[in-house]
Amino acid sequence: MMIYSCGDVDFLLQNLDEKDLVFSHHSKKRIGQRLINKAFVKNMLFNFDPIEILPGDFANAFKLFYPSQFNPRKELVVVIAVNEINVVVKSLWEN
């Protein structure tokens, strides 16, 4: 299993293809609960550089920070897991 760094994730996001992006079941629940628009999240991942990329709580997991969809004083936090095939959105929330 390849171990990715924050720099690797930045490069992967720049070259991400829509078929390689997967939303986990848990993230879909959060989208509904928090009224976060899936299209907004996809737009951020495909078209904007994250404000910051931090390592997540387990190997190949990362926290990406983007501007909030609803509140300019908050950030959208997107937790992803990366493997050789996909980028999986595990969870998201506004901070």
Q: How would you label these PLM feature ranges?
A:
Residues 1-95:
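Ribonuclease/tRNase effector modules and their secretory precursors
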